[in-house]
Amino acid sequence: MLRVNIVGIGPGNPKLLTGAALEAINQSTILIGDKRMLANFASEKRFYDTIKTAEICNICANANPEKDIVSILVSGDVGFFSLAKTISGKLPDCECVRFCGISSLVYFAQQLQMSWDDAKIISMHGRRQNFIEAVAHNEKVFALTGGENSPQALCAKLCRFGLGGVQVYVGENLSYDNENISSMKAKEAAQKQFSSLSVMMIINKDAKTLAHNVHGLNDDLFMRSKVPMTKQEIRAVSISKLMPQETDVIYDIGAGTGSCSIELALQAKRGMVYAFERNPEAVQLIEKNKELFGVENLTVIAGEASEKLEEMPVPDCVFIGGSGGNLCKMLDTIYAKNVNCRVVINAITVETLIEVVEYYKQHESYALDIVNVFAARAKKLGAYNLMMSQNPVYIMTALKKGE
C-alpha cells in the first residue's frame, strides 16, 4: 500500500515546520503542492506543481508502492479549512498519514500578541458565510480571505452594512520576507489593496449579542410602511411549521416588508433566503430591513415570482405569503425542483384555502395540515384593556408523506 503523507507546512516559511513534518518530507520521493510550497525543498525529489484533487489522485495511482513515499504539502494546519479533508477521502487504497502544521490563525495571533480562543472563525476563501452577522455579533472575528473576498472587498461590505468603524488587522504574506501587518478602520481598509495571501482579525467593541433565536420577532424591530406585514404571532407559527435548517435554501414568495425573510435568514445562517416581491416599494423596504438586521444571506428578487422560479437554486423549503394568482403554477415548479420541499402557505381568504386544498387533493403524496390562527392584542382605552382581534389566517403546511 502506498504511503501518502499529508503535511501541514504552516504559513509558508520552512523554519516554522514541525520536526515530524520535516522528517516526513525528507523521507519522501514525491512531493506534491503548489509552486510556492515546493520551492523550499531539495530538487532531487520528483515535484508535481498541483493542488487539484483529480491530478493528485492520478499521481498517487501511478506511484510505486514498493519504492515511493508521497508527501502532499498543504498550507497551514491539516485540520484547519484544509485540502487534507478532501484528499484523504479520495485515496482509499493508500495509507494516509496527516502531519499538523501551524495555522495562519495561530501565527497571526502570535504576531498580534493576541489570544484567539475567543475569536469567531470563518473562512471566506471559496465559501459562502454570513460575514456581516459574524462581525456584528462577535467582538473578535478571524477571517480567511481569498478570491473575490479580498480584505478590501470584505471591508467595503462592512461599510455597506454600517460597520465601517470596526478595527481591522490585515496580515499579508505571513511568515515570508515581505510579511506585512497593518491596522486600521474597515472604512480605511476598503480603499486599499492587499496581497492575495491575506488574513484578517476584526475587532468590534460594539458587538451585539445575537438575541434573534426565537420565531416571532417583535413587529417594532422592523422598518415598516403601508406595505402589508406578516404579524409577529402569525410569523412565529408559520416559521415553526416551516422548520428551517441552518443550511437551507429558502424561498419567501410575496415577501412584503421582508419580516419573514429576515427571520428565515437569521435561522438559516449558512444557507440562503430568496425574497420574491413584485411591489417596488416593498422591494426597497426589504433591502432596508436586510441592512438593518445585517443578513447578507438574503437576496431580493424583484418581479413576478412565477416568472423567476425556474432559474433559481433548488429550495429546501418555501414560504408563500402571496402568490399573485399563480399559486398552482408555482407549486408545480417548486416540486419539479425538489419533490421533498417543505411548503407553508398563508391565506386570509376562503378562496385561497379552497385552492390549496384542491391542489393537494390532486397531489396525494403530500400531507396537508391546516391551522386557523386567531390573534388578538390588548389596546388601552382609558382605564381598560380591550382585546382587538387581527384577521384570522389559515396556515397550511404540506410535507411529503413519510418525511
PLM regions and their residue ranges:
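A contiguous loop/helix-start segment that scaffolds small-molecule binding in enzyme catalytic cores
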Residues: L2-G8, G19, T50, D68-V70, ...
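Conserved SAM-binding loop
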Residues: I286-E287
